[in-house]
Amino acid sequence: DRLRSRGLGDVYKRQVQPLGNSDGKWKAIVDNMTELCGSAPQLIDELYKSESATNFNNRSIAWLLKNYNRIYDDPDMSLDLYTRQCSMGITAEQLSICGATIANEGLNPNTNKQVFDKALAPKITSMIATVGFYQHTGDWLYTSGIPAKTGVGGGVMGVMPGVMGISAFAPPLDDAGNSVKAQLAIKYIMNKLGMNVFNGHRIHVQ
C-alpha cells in the first residue's frame, strides 16, 4: 500500500467547504476538474470500490490525524472523497488541457474561462516541479526540462509555463510508480523541440 499512502496529504485537501457536506464537496471537486480539463471526467466505479475495500493504511492515518486535530471534518468522509477523486478516469487530451490551463495562468485555452487566479499558476507549477515524480523528480527535471506530475494510473502531465501542456499515458510503471513509456515519450518530444523550462535568453548590452 506504499503508493496509496503517498496521497494522505491530499486527504487533508479534501476538506473543502462546505464542512460536513459530502455531496457539496464532491460537486466542488468535480466542477473544478471539469473546468480545468474542459470536459467532465468519469468515475471508474469498479476502481473506486476496489480502492475503498483495501485502503486500510490510509484509513488508519486519517484517524490518527483526526486524533491530533489535523483533520477538521469527518475522516472517513475525507478519505472517501480522496478515494473517489483517485478513481476518476481522464483522457490524455483532458490531461493535456489541464496542463495547458495551468501553463496559461489559469485560463483554459479551449473554453477561454479563467479557472483560478493567475497568481496561483507559478505556485502550482513549482509544486509540480518539486514533487511531481516522487524520488525521481530531480532526474526527471534534469533530463526532460519540463515540470510534470505523474500518477500511478500511468498518466504524466507536463506544464511548460506560457507555452503549453502535454501529456502521455501508458500503464507500466517504474519502481517509483511513474509511467515508463509516458516519461520516454514526453522527454523525447521536449528534447526534440529543444524546449526546456531552465533555458534562458541571453541579454546583449550595447
Each predicted region: which residue ranges?
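Structured C-terminal helix/loop/strand segments within mature extracytoplasmic catalytic/sensor domains
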Residues: 102-206
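Conserved active-site and cofactor/substrate-binding residues in soluble primary-metabolism enzymes
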Residues: 24, 28, 56, 60, ...
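Short, charged, amphipathic alpha-helices and their helix-cap/turn boundaries
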Residues: 5-6, 21-42, 64-69
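Active-site-proximal helix/loop microenvironment
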Residues: 18, 43-111, 115
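Single conserved hydrophobic/aromatic residue that forms the stacking wall/gate
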Residues: 1-12
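Non-transmembrane alpha-helical segments in soluble domains
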Residues: 30, 34, 62, 96-99, ...
